[in-house]
Amino acid sequence: MAKKIEAYIKLQVAAGQANPSPPVGPALGQRGVNIMEFCKAFNAKTQGMEPGLPIPTVITVYSDRSFTFITKTPPAPVLLKKAAGIKSGSGRPNTDKVGTVTRAQLEEIAKTKEPDLTAADMEAAVRTIAGTARSMGLNVEGL
């Protein structure tokens, strides 16, 4: 018989840097999950990724206090900021442009994000990422 699901917990945790401090500790502690067990498993799974990159994670907590978790790809704005070499997006994206990204950079980000995007093909995925870039105040070259 399948285990009864008690809760889903959605967190963004830095790759390879999960520790019992907030936000991880309180979110898991409320549900009675072994926090250190999650931290060790998460850090082991994200070992090959760039340290500090925020990773969206969905943790499924079962009634017997066990858990499973799924890691997703880093958020597109984080990848775009890294590609453009900027700290943050524009406060007024239509008037103040803060950087530029090329089509090659957009394709690279779209390939990284492909498992989490609902785009029909790679061209649609690139256009989706380009829209995110424009909404952050980045110029898009090559589209």
Swiss-Prot record:
Task: Tell me the GO BP annotations in alphabetical order.
Answer: translation
> What keywords does the record list, in alphabetical order?
Methylation, Ribonucleoprotein, Ribosomal protein, RNA-binding, rRNA-binding
Q: Note the subunit structure.
A: Part of the ribosomal stalk of the 50S ribosomal subunit. Interacts with L10 and the large rRNA to form the base of the stalk. L10 forms an elongated spine to which L12 dimers bind in a sequential fashion forming a multimeric L10(L12)X complex.
An annotated Gene Ontology molecular function: large ribosomal subunit rRNA binding
| Lineage start | Bacteria, Pseudomonadati, Pseudomonadota, Gammaproteobacteria, Pseudomonadales
CDD domains xrefs: Ribosomal_L11
What the entry says about post-translational processing?
Answer: One or more lysine residues are methylated.
Tell me the organism.
Answer: Marinobacter nauticus (strain ATCC 700491 / DSM 11845 / VT8)
Q: Name one Pfam family in it.
A: Ribosomal_L11
What family name appears in the similarity comment?
Belongs to the universal ribosomal protein uL11 family.
This protein's name: Large ribosomal subunit protein uL11
- The record lists the membrane-crossing segments as none
The reply to whether Aminoacyl-tRNA synthetase figures as a keyword in the UniProt entry is no
Looking up NCBIfam families in the UniProt record yields:
L11_bact
